[in-house]
A protein has these predicted regions:
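Catalytic domains of riboflavin
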Residues: 1-264
Length: 264
């Protein structure tokens, strides 16, 4: 079945072209496939396709900044769901919609919500579009379809938001990989995996920032270069103590030490 899985670079390319694709998560997680598209490309035809052929809940994946900009509160202040999916209250565009549930109305709500010029005055709650807040750090922090949709949209140079919809079988059961492959063949869609997206980001993202460097003198070894790095995902700081000059052509002995404030 691996031959039906496209490299994540191809999935990013599909997103950049405004095309829909299927994203699959791990078997030991939700073990499902979602129809995914960058939110800025989610027109009425796309919403109708998702409703007709995905059959799951059509959701709007947003980053934390946009959720705050829209003033959206979480659906639950005590999230006990299995995967802690961060649903916010549902939304509707304040202007231009009728009942709110039509494909056109939901597409309008989505385009209104993701606009750079939109704020909380442009939407109302509740509504027929279901935003989900992605974790800062994306799939490197949480390996969910929400984070994957936002990550891929960003990597594709799009508005950092996505529309996702779980794919279900005709009988109402969840589509697994064999069924997802048939859906992909039928509609000429590419399939990618969240696992490949995680690997891609690990290999290509620069998530460590060098924030400070100074020379210190210690009774244990004399002079050292003390370099402080910050992890951009969780803001944790890491300290490297370097003795002497590092030659990239030589093997350098490294010792990793877990900090204990009370004993060090």
């Amino acid at each position: 079945m691996k031959k039906y899985i496209s490299p994540i670079e191809d999935i990013i390319s599909e997103a950049s072209k405004g095309n829909m694709f299927i994203l699959v998560d791990a078997e030991d997680r939700e073990n499902e496939g979602d129809l995914v598209i960058a939110a800025e490309d989610a027109n009425a035809d796309v919403i109708n396709f998702m409703a007709k052929n995905g059959r799951g809940l059509i959701c709007l994946a947003l980053n934390e900044d946009k959720v705050d900009n829209l003033g959206l509160s979480l659906m639950s202040s005590n999230n006990k769901s299995r995967h802690e999916t961060a649903f916010t209250v549902s939304i509707e565009a304040r202007e231009g919609v009728t009942t709110g549930i039509s494909a056109y109305d939901r597409a309008l709500t989505i385009s209104t919500a993701i606009s750079e010029n939109t704020n909380s005055t442009d939407i109302v709650t509740p509504g027929h579009v279901f935003p989900i807040k992605a974790r800062p750090g994306g799939v490197l922090v949480r390996a969910g379809h929400t984070e994957a949709a936002v990550d891929i949209a960003k990597l594709a140079g799009k508005n950092p938001s996505g529309v996702i919809c779980e794919i279900m079988n005709d009988d109402g059961t969840m589509a697994r990989l064999p069924e997802l492959i048939e859906v992909a063949k039928k509609f000429n869609l590419k399939i990618g995996t969240i696992a490949d997206l995680i690997s891609y980001r690990i290999n290509n993202d620069h998530i460590i920032t060098r924030v400070h460097n100074e020379r210190i003198v210690s009774e244990f070894g004399g002079e050292w270069d003390c370099i402080v790095y910050k992890n951009d995902l969780d803001k944790a700081e890491h300290i490297a103590l370097v003795k002497g000059k590092i030659n990239s052509n030589e093997i350098i002995p490294v010792r990793v030490h877990s900090v204990n404030i009370f004993e060090d």
